[in-house]
Amino acid sequence: MGQKVHPNGIRLGISRPWNATWYANTNEFADNLHSDFQVRKFLNKELRNASVSRIVIDRPAKSVRVTIHTARPGVVIGKKGEDVEKLRKQVSKLTGAPAQINISEVRKPELDSQLVADNIAGQLERRVMFRRAMKRAVQNAIRLGAKGIKVEVSGRLGGAEIARTEWYREGRVPLHTLRADIDYSTSEANTTYGIIGVKVWIFRGEVLGGLPTEEKPAPKRGKNRK
């Protein structure tokens, strides 16, 4: 039976960057890794309603720089920047180093696999039919320019006695092509019948030379003006 490698792990350093970029001595590595885990856990808990896509952590010159990619930057920043200042103090306390927090807005949340997976999980928790939630997510992604998308949900779908897996795909999702920009994420929906797992793969185009390739617009038809 064929098994699938993790789409993000196999592309690290090729077409996908790391979520933490820092170097450390052998003595400090474990402490830094643990503080990274604590920071991510804290931020995901505090910002669970802020549509956070991913959290990138840098450690320049004995300080910590956290970049939060979110579709709702206003929720993270708060009134006059009060909320982000509280987060900065807490992150500095967790890491034991001066902290800086940057906010990066996700312009198209429909093309971000983590936000799509969280959205589907939220709909399942609100008792929306799983097929409707899946189909809506697929249609939105294709409409906004995705080359392909696959959505998979597994668990006691619709309250069934026996757990099963259902998936829906549209377009191309080439998992073996390393230059393919595949965005993969998972989420969980806590329903009254148990946990339902959600997986999302989004193919956003091919990456050449470290940057996503952009399709040139077709030339407009008409008379040439001299």
Swiss-Prot record:
Pfam families: KH_2, Ribosomal_S3_C
GO CC field: cytosolic small ribosomal subunit
PROSITE patterns: KH_TYPE_2, RIBOSOMAL_S3
GO biological process, one term: translation
Keywords from the named record: Ribonucleoprotein, Ribosomal protein, RNA-binding, rRNA-binding
InterPro entries xrefs: KH_dom, KH_dom-like_a/b, KH_dom_type_2, KH_sf_prok-type, Ribosomal_S3_C_sf, Ribosomal_uS3_bac-typ, Ribosomal_uS3_C, Ribosomal_uS3_CS
Disulfide bonds: none
Residues in KH type-2 domain copies: 39-107
MF terms (GO), sorted A to Z: mRNA binding; rRNA binding; structural constituent of ribosome
Keyword Cell cycle: no
Keyword Iron-sulfur attached: no
PANTHER family: 30S/40S RIBOSOMAL PROTEIN S3, SMALL RIBOSOMAL SUBUNIT PROTEIN US3C
Purpose of the protein: Binds the lower part of the 30S subunit head. Binds mRNA in the 70S ribosome, positioning it for translation.
Quaternary structure note: Part of the 30S ribosomal subunit. Forms a tight complex with proteins S10 and S14.
Family: Belongs to the universal ribosomal protein uS3 family.
Protein's UniProt name: Small ribosomal subunit protein uS3
Taxonomic source organism: Idiomarina loihiensis (strain ATCC BAA-735 / DSM 15497 / L2-TR)
